[in-house]
Amino acid sequence: MENLFVYGTLLDPKVRRRIFGISLDGCWDALPGYKKEEGIVAGTYPGIMPSDPERSEVAGLLFSLPSEILARVDTYEGSLYYRKTLNLRSGKSAWVYLPAENQIR
């Protein structure tokens, strides 16, 4: 199983069900040292950027997914984002999608 932290369009249960192919419950967590910005990816989608670790964090949901579902999320995110392992406030590490540099507007 793979940990995935989501903070944008995948917070919407309808979008998650369409991408994951099943209904899954996540748990709330946060990513310290980042800030969320709306519309910075391709001028439309949210993204997160490094920020002051003492004052900034991004709230989101943490899911434990089979690798097959994570591969579907990779396809959904496409070339707009890349996946990186980061540490969450809970102490768990998870994959997080960060904006691809060439997509930031």
Q: At which residue positions do the language-model features occur?
A:
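Glycine-aromatic micro-motifs
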Residues: M1-R105
